């Protein structure tokens, strides 16, 4: 039996992700990390910066994050990226 290693609950939600080398869509998000699909290139061990767009009734917000790529996986022409968030901030879009 495998022991669950996650510290925070994951929420399955599709949100737009913006990176320097592409765009993507989240599959799931937690307080300490997220998984997203993107058309671009990332490898395990990379340190990346990215933004997640959050839509609210009164306007958009951007969650700006830095993190380390824990693992990647392939699906057709997309790359799945699991990221551990090291720091983040929220801004009005």
Predicted feature descriptions by range:
Residues 31, 72-77:
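Short, conserved beta-turn/loop elements at beta-strand boundaries and strand-helix junctions
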Residues 75-86:
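Short, solvent-exposed secondary-structure boundary/capping segments
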Residues 53-58:
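Short, charged beta-turn/beta-strand-edge "cap" motif at the junction between a beta-strand
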Residues 37-42, 72:
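Short, surface-exposed secondary-structure edge patches
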Residues 1-29:
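N-terminal helix initiation/capping motif
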Residues 18-21, 59-66:
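Short coil-to-beta-strand transition motifs
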Residues 26, 67-69:
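Conserved hydrophobic positions within beta-strands
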């Amino acid at each position: 039996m495998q022991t669950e290693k996650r510290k925070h609950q994951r929420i399955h939600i599709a949100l737009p992700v913006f990176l320097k080398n592409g765009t993507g869509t989240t599959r799931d998000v937690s307080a300490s990390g997220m998984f997203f699909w993107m058309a671009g290139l990332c490898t395990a061990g990379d340190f990346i910066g990215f933004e997640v767009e959050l839509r609210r009734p009164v306007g958009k917000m951007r969650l700006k994050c830095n993190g380390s790529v824990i693992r990647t996986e392939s699906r057709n022409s997309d790359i799945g990226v699991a990221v551990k968030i090291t720091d983040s901030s929220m801004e009005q879009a």
